[in-house]
A protein has these predicted regions:
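Solvent-exposed interaction patches of small proteins and small membrane subunits
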Residues: 1-105
Length: 105
């Protein structure tokens, strides 16, 4: 589950970066997940910056989880906080992509 979280986080922030680029957001070309998440929050693409920055931190430290208690804590975070944030981002990105596509026609 933790490995899937890491993969999903990577895909999520990179998808956010692409949609920000489509909308012409200045600064979207950076390679930094932190900057992309902060820009996404500033522009209203991300609802809860604290959750996303916590995800970034947990993604970076999850490779160093060595005991069952830490695994259990991470699973609870994923279930209770991170999955809802991914779902909300998916909805927002679909809407923003549709907006960008309608501008092309």
């Amino acid at each position: 589950m933790i490995g899937q979280f890491n993969l999903t986080f990577e895909l999520a922030w990179k998808a956010l970066q692409e949609i920000l680029r489509l909308h012409g957001a200045e600064g979207a070309d950076t390679g930094s997940p932190r900057e992309i998440l902060q820009l996404g929050y500033k522009l209203g693409f991300v609802n809860d910056s604290a959750v996303w920055l916590l995800m970034l931190k947990k993604r970076n430290t999850s490779v160093h989880i060595y005991n069952e208690q830490e695994v259990d804590e991470m699973i609870l975070l994923i279930r209770d906080s991170f999955i809802p944030a991914f779902v909300a981002l998916e909805k927002t990105l679909r809407e923003k992509l549709a907006e960008a596509e309608s501008d092309w026609t």
